[in-house]
């Protein structure tokens, strides 16, 4: 019995409107309700306008009679005055005669609600929070006269629910009040109605229903007595905390978040690792480019982007590569870096530590200390740079299938603690001294590499260049030299010797749960093109020294991002070889960049860029209407 009473699904009762219990009050509308100005200002404006144009038209009429001018010969000011006269007259008649007009044309509101055609069109859902199941035939405190009051607390707007609902008719209500047997398979009416918070229902698409307890919490957050960041720990329900924080934010700012979805997301999955103080989530469309034939295997590449033409262009590049036999990618290096900065009292002491760290005899000892931090992290090298009495130590290590920033940081901290024994005068200024260098364009990443260093190449047949890419080998080679090489050099580019590598990198990063900010160094790329096979075919390659990706940790564990990794066959940690999945992901990113570079350069060479963007990347919506 107890188990049957504790239903996990909260049922919903729908009250059918009738003549006795209308869902909305019969309040007649007025013409002034359609205007945003206060009533007294609206009336003053139209009264003034009405008498002004009447005086003007009568004066003009008198002048025309005196000058023997036909009355139908009107000037532009007279036309404007006539329109103003008609508009003000309509308003004044509507304002003072609305009740009379409605009585002649429109049925009373009570008759409207009582019609059979409207009974199913105006259902009001009353959600129960703490209801209890009552056996059939028991006396219930749910008399019929209380129903209209409860119904008025909920907006009479049709609400949809995916769950099946039971319709409580007026006859059922009379049976309950008389103690007769009624089908009580659902819960009884709630002891207290929910509080409905609605703001400008004709402009908002959502109605937030909160309990009295949630309403008190919202008021506390708005008042500042309850910190917003503590809602998850205090409530124990991440989604409820997000909903309360969202409503409090709307009240504090006076701005609506109706376009930002709340439902359909697992907020437990981001607690303490991906995002703090969530109020919803942003939806980004994911397109598929491919198949990309890379190293003898086909990949369907997911790309999350809002830029039109990007997926289509990359897809065209994949087609050209596939028709030409595929592309080949080679991993050159795999090592994440972290560079702390330490300071000594003299430059001599800083140099002594530099010589100590770069001595091969000391590397094994330092590697043992470093490798204690993780079973995947393995120290590869230490590179030092001095600036006066400050020393920058750039540690490089393998990190398995993780991107590895946290892993290398823990290993570096172990080494710094170990060095304090022999260098007690060493002052650690920061665990990161920007010699790493993370999320910033830096020559050290371009030259030394960071993360995965990959090169990818393909030979595109001349027929494919002409038929698929709609250009020629000679045009592509010339454009690549003048744009990607000479043009980038003229601009003083650092790692930017490409057409749009960042576009593809960022789209794949967002889709697969990588850190989008690391596209700064991950997009370092040089694109090379040259004619081969007596000038008939095109050899194209991209070299990317700093691709920072992982298949475990961070955003990769989220459902959507995990699905995209699974599509590529690199989800989670590799069961065979540590780091194999993350290295495979890096090669796929490089192959997709190769396809994107090939297609965009072809569009530029053929003069198709502007035409394609006007067709696929131009909004057809009137932004002024959206903003209003």
Curated annotation (Swiss-Prot):
PROSITE patterns: HMG_COA_REDUCTASE_1 (PS00066), HMG_COA_REDUCTASE_2 (PS00318), HMG_COA_REDUCTASE_3 (PS01192), HMG_COA_REDUCTASE_4 (PS50065). It catalyses: (R)-mevalonate + 2 NADP(+) + CoA = (3S)-3-hydroxy-3-methylglutaryl-CoA + 2 NADPH + 2 H(+). Residues 99-212 are annotated as: Linker. It is a multi-pass membrane protein. The chain crosses the membrane at residues 38-58, 78-98. Coiled coil: none annotated. It comes from Gossypium hirsutum (Upland cotton). Belongs to the HMG-CoA reductase family. The gene is HMG2. Catalyzes the synthesis of mevalonate. The specific precursor of all isoprenoid compounds present in plants. InterPro entries: HMG_CoA_Rdtase, HMG_CoA_Rdtase_cat_sf, HMG_CoA_Rdtase_CS, HMG_CoA_Rdtase_eu_arc, HMG_CoA_Rdtase_N, HMG_CoA_Rdtase_NAD(P)-bd_sf, HMG_CoA_Rdtase_sub-bd_dom_sf. GO terms for cellular component: endoplasmic reticulum membrane; mitochondrial membrane; peroxisomal membrane; plastid membrane. The active site is at residues 307, 439, 515, 613. Pathway: Metabolic intermediate biosynthesis; (R)-mevalonate biosynthesis; (R)-mevalonate from acetyl-CoA: step 3/3. One of its GO terms (molecular function) is hydroxymethylglutaryl-CoA reductase (NADPH) activity. This is 3-hydroxy-3-methylglutaryl-coenzyme A reductase 2. The lineage of its organism: Eukaryota, Viridiplantae, Streptophyta, Embryophyta, Tracheophyta. It holds the Pfam family HMG-CoA_red. Glycans are attached at residues 153, 371, 484, 617, 625. PANTHER family: 3-HYDROXY-3-METHYLGLUTARYL-COENZYME A REDUCTASE, 3-HYDROXY-3-METHYLGLUTARYL-COENZYME A REDUCTASE 1.
């Amino acid at each position: 019995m107890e188990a049957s009473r504790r239903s996990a699904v909260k049922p919903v009762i729908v009250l059918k409107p009738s003549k006795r219990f209308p869902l909305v009050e019969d309040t007649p509308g007025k013409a002034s309700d359609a205007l945003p100005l206060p009533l007294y200002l609206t009336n003053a404006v139209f009264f003034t306008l009405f008498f002004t144009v009447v005086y003007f038209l009568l004066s003009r009429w008198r002048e025309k009679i005196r000058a023997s001018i036909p009355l139908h010969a009107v000037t532009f000011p007279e036309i404007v005055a006539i329109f103003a006269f008609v508009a003000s007259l309509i308003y004044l008649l509507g304002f003072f005669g609305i009740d009379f007009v409605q009585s002649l044309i429109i049925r009373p509101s009570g008759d409207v609600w009582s019609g059979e055609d409207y009974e199913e069109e105006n259902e009001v859902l009353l959600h129960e929070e703490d209801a209890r199941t009552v056996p059939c035939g028991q006396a219930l405190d749910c008399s019929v006269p209380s129903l209209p009051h409860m119904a008025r607390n909920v907006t009479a707007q049709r609400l949809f629910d995916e769950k099946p609902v039971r319709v409580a008719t007026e006859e059922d209500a009379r049976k309950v009040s008389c103690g007769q047997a009624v089908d009580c398979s659902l819960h009884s009416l709630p002891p207290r109605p929910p509080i409905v918070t609605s703001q400008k229902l004709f402009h908002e698409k959502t109605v937030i229903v909160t309990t009295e307890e949630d309403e008190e919490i919202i008021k506390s957050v708005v008042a500042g007595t309850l910190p917003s960041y503590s809602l998850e720990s205090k409530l124990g329900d991440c989604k409820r905390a997000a909903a309360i924080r969202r409503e409090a934010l709307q009240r504090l700012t006076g701005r609506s978040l109706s376009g930002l979805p709340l439902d359909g997301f697992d907020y437990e999955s981001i607690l303490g690792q991906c995002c703090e103080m969530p109020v919803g989530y942003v939806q980004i469309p994911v397109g598929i480019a491919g198949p990309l034939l890379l190293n003898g295997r086909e990949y369907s590449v997911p790309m999350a982007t809002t830029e039109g033409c990007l997926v289509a262009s990359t897809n065209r590049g994949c087609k050209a590569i596939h028709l030409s036999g595929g592309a080949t990618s080679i991993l050159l290096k795999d090592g994440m870096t972290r560079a702390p900065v330490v300071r000594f009292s003299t430059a001599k002491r800083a140099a002594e530590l530099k010589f100590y760290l770069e001595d091969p005899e000391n590397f094994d000892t330092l590697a043992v200390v470093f490798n204690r931090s993780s079973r995947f992290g393995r120290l590869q090298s230490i590179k030092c740079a001095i600036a006066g009495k400050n020393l920058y130590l750039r540690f490089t290590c393998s990190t398995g299938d993780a991107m590895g920033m946290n892993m290398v940081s823990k290993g570096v901290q172990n080494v710094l603690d170990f060095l304090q024994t022999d260098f007690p005068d060493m002052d650690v200024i920061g665990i990161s001294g920007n010699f790493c260098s993370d999320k910033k364009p830096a020559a050290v990443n371009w030259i030394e590499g960071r993360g995965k260093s990959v090169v990818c190449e393909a030979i595109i047949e001349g027929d494919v260049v002409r038929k698929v890419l709609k250009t020629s080998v000679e045009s592509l080679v010339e454009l690549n030299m003048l744009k990607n090489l000479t043009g980038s050099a003229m601009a003083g580019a650092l790692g930017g010797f490409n057409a749009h590598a960042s576009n593809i990198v960022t789209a794949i990063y967002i889709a697969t749960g990588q850190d989008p900010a690391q596209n700064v160094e991950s997009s370092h790329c040089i694109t090379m093109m040259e004619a081969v096979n007596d000038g008939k075919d095109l050899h194209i390659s991209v070299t990317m020294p700093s691709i920072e990706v992982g298949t475990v940790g961070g955003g990769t564990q989220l459902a959507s991002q995990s699905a995209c990794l699974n599509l590529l066959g690199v989800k989670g940690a590799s069961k065979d070889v540590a780091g194999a999945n993350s290295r495979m992901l890096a090669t796929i990113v490089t192959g997709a960049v190769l396809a994107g570079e090939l297609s965009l350069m072809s569009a530029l060479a053929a003069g198709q860029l502007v035409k394609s963007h006007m067709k696929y990347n131009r909004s057809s919506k009137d932004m002024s209407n959206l903003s209003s």
